[in-house]
Amino acid sequence: MLGVAWSERLQEIHLQLMGAVQLEVVRGLLSDRYGLSVDFGSAGILYKETLSAPSMGIGHFEPLRHYAEAHLLVEPGPRGSGVVFGTRCSEDELDRNWQRLILANAMERDHVGVLTGAPLTDVRITLCAGRAHAKHTEGGDFRQATYRAVRQALMCARSRGECVLLEPWYAFELEVPEDKLGRAMSDMTRMGGRFGAPSAGAAPAASDAGAGAGASGGIATLAGEVPASELGDYALEVAAYTGGRGRLSLQLAGYEPCHDADRVIEEAAYDPEADLPNTPDSVFCSHGAGYTVKWQEVPAHAHVADDPSLLRPWRPADAAFFGGE
């Protein structure tokens, strides 16, 4: 299935494709059906970001006649879990309606990381504390406080070296003539891949498919996993050095820590503090005027103190929570 996504930050349409052939098919369809002549930019890797340790974030939004403060804990989750939301906040400290609003606001946004601006994934975001004002709090105030709290948590984690860049990995099965096996193993090692012992000989039984080994008719099979960023047009390279007898099969294996994160981060040149729609800073009020407080200084200005003794058992932000049970 073709993956299509709009990048608001880059103002670009991103396509998730499996190779040059599919790209040409898409180009042809756009021309035949809609009369569009479309140029495609060079392919890029879909990186993601996560955390390696929990990080508490505080967001405060208090321009004149507005008020909201939210404390959200962002902590690492199991690989492949996406972004999970819940609460440990006592209803004695913050009314359930405000808690629902905070978590609804958190769930509506596609949060991005602070290393490259890549999507945030594999984290659990938990509401731990907050405060509203009986007169001045409006719904949009908590939206601003919530976004800033998540962002402030990520910036704190970044300052401690606890942000992790993730990259996609492919599970591969590479069939090559036996006399080209050394070349194939060398290539996969150079790419940072990992693989089991190759096998050559009779064709593998159906039960062995995917076990990482098998061969037939002088064709050896090498199976393992490799970073997607290293593959490029390797399928074409395989066809070239095997005289058309080689075959490379790929399947997405998931995301793992990026093997060359420093290079990717440097090339991205992403400045999280310059990304104003995702600001980590908060807004406080003094003498009738709002003023901005940088993310590093927000905890010292916060109106609510984090008290672990007030936390309740974790509850997911699911249909029962929003339904009033």
Indicate where each model-derived feature is located.
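Accessory interaction regions appended to the cores of large information-processing enzymes
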Residues: M1-E325
